[in-house]
């Protein structure tokens, strides 16, 4: 008997019950773990859970954080500097709207890693196969044929068959269009001061360095100057000291923007810089009037083809010299447009933008067949 007189508790059956409950709890946990593991392994969403978890840390009502991976910076190799002369480069995001920056360099050590190589035709024109980048070409690397010269000045094009993936030139049908100049719209305050007609003390100017007697432009000039005084600057003509060209040409009412080669879209700095930036009305000899009108208003220039002879053109220019209202009509387009001239940095950034937009890989079968 218990000395206190109380009966002993029945401990054995309680211990069995506790052990049974513990085993049941362990079994439930184990099977739950197996189910979760199976769901995670198969990737199927579990009931009541999101397949993609929301971004944490964003305040209520704010837009979700952009989780799109950023594009890698493209590496572009300039196989040579244009005409072997280094030029200043700029951030492409500041040069071309919508473009991301590219790393552009002329360091050939990066050739194996470069996404693209820009090859300036003039710099490899003589014996091109020995001057092109070496083989084997890195997988996926694109080569860009870059040229601003007309077909007669481009030799050995046939040696470039199947080497290049993209074209880059003044031709508007190039993969990368790099004209010598263009007009851009503007609004608000005038982008330029009003034309000071009293400063236009001279009539017609022409600056020319490549003087060939048998060329179309020299022959036309020789016929024109028989009826009209033309001041010619350049080699074997009036000197034009460096840094004074714009100041000198701005004194003239008209400028002869005569191209040295007559080919579609070949409209050079003779018009965009020498004439328009000097506020002289360009008298053009080059591609057709309709070709010029793709890039300029019809009343922004005078085309030699509009006249039956150089004598008729001379008479027309003399009439405009005396009729201020008609002369000033050639500047009306400047109320809404302004001229811009090319830069090497901008051209390279256009290539940067094109490479970002166009990922397909193509091969030019024949540069010569396309360009000439």
UniProtKB/Swiss-Prot annotation:
Bilayer topology term: Single-pass type II membrane protein
Modifications made to the protein after synthesis: Glycosylated.
Carbohydrate-modified residues: 165, 196
SUPFAM superfamilies in the cross-refs: UDP-Glycosyltransferase/glycogen phosphorylase (SSF53756)
Keywords: Glycoprotein, Glycosyltransferase, Golgi apparatus, Lipid metabolism, Membrane, Signal-anchor, Transferase, Transmembrane, Transmembrane helix
Residue numbers on the Cytoplasmic membrane side: 1-15
Cellular localisation: Golgi apparatus, Golgi stack membrane
One GO cellular component term noted in the UniProt record for this chain: Golgi cisterna membrane
Pathway info: Protein modification; protein glycosylation
The enzyme's E.C. designation: 2.4.1.65, 2.4.1.152, 2.4.1.-
Name of the molecule in the record: 3-galactosyl-N-acetylglucosaminide 4-alpha-L-fucosyltransferase FUT3
């Amino acid at each position: 008997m218990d000395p206190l007189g109380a009966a002993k508790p029945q401990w054995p059956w309680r211990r069995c019950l506790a052990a049974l409950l513990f085993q049941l709890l362990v079994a439930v946990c184990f099977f739950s773990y197996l189910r979760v593991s199976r769901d995670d392994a198969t990737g199927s969403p579990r009931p009541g859970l999101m397949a993609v978890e929301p971004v944490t840390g964003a305040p209520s009502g704010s837009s979700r954080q952009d989780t799109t991976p950023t594009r890698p910076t493209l590496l572009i190799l300039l196989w040579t500097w244009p005409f072997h002369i280094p030029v200043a480069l700029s951030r492409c995001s500041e040069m071309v709207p919508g473009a991301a920056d590219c790393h552009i360099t002329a360091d050939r050590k990066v050739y194996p890693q470069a996404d693209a190589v820009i090859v300036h035709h003039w710099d490899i024109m003589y014996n091109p196969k020995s001057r092109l980048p070496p083989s084997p070409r890195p997988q996926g690397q694109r080569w860009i044929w870059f040229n601003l010269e007309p077909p007669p000045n481009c030799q050995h094009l046939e040696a470039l068959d199947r080497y290049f993936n993209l074209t880059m030139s003044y031709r508007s049908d190039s993969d990368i269009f790099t004209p010598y100049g263009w007009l851009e719209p503007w609004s608000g305050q005038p982008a330029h001061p009003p034309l000071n007609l009293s400063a236009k003390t001279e009539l017609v100017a022409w600056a020319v360095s490549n003087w060939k007697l048998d060329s179309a432009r020299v022959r036309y000039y020789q016929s024109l100057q028989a009826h009209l005084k033309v001041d010619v600057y350049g080699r074997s003509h009036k000197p034009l000291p460096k840094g004074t060209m714009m100041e000198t040409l701005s004194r003239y009412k008209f400028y002869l923007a005569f191209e040295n080669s007559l080919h579609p879209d070949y409209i050079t700095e003779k018009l965009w810089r020498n004439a328009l930036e000097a506020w002289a009305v360009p008298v053009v000899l080059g591609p057709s009037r309709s070709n010029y009108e793709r890039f300029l208003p019809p009343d922004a220039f005078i085309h030699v083809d509009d006249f039956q002879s150089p004598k008729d053109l001379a008479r027309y220019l003399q009439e405009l010299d005396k009729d201020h209202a008609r002369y000033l009509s050639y500047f009306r387009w400047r109320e809404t447009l302004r001229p811009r001239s090319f830069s090497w940095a901008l051209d390279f950034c256009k290539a940067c933008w094109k490479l970002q937009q166009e990922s397909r890989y193509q091969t030019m079968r024949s540069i010569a067949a396309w360009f000439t």
